[in-house]
Amino acid sequence: MDLFGETPDWATYLSPILTKYKNRKHPLAYENLYQLVVMVILSAQDSDANINTIAPALFEIYPDMERLSVTNREVLLPNISTVRNFRTKANWLIEIAQIIEKNENIPLTMNALTALKGIGRKSANVIMRESNQPAEGIIADLHVIRVAPRIGLISETKDGNKVEKQLIQVLPKSIWGEIGMAISFLGREICRPKPKCDLCPINNFCAYYANEN
């Protein structure tokens, strides 16, 4: 949405949330890259809070890719049984561990990550951002899917890949690595389903706020 009769300078408009949230760690309470990959896969269609709850006990049993690669599905399942779609995710985790074998073999490019079962573009973008890799895309989680259209940045769609594609078209590559999580944190804290607009650092440039006031 164009609020000002010309193409919006979104990089400038969004700079307050980039400043506010830049380099803030993802809410998944991982301690290393192996844990991050496992937790990102488990968190699909589930909550970060739930995955954080089950993770400590899981990683006591499976501290690395090597240990995970030699387990079997029936042994793994009870340890992730409270996770949504846990049976499918167990298959993914074991297959990935058998392919990768060791923690140091975990890939860190978009193509290599998305070649693994259970890792789509959103998950790959999270892994790459948290690993300080050059961005090849923009994180589009459920918060970004809700917030980006609301503020007028993109048109509305529930498809995360379409959201990411639109964001890539309107935002400079220099901010790809951080802007997805910045919008996500805004959505988690302020731009909730019932938004706290008066607290928002970018309400002056928000289509929703303009329409409501």
Regions found by a protein language model. Give the residues of each.
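Catalytic cores of DNA base-excision repair glycosylases
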Residues: 2-213
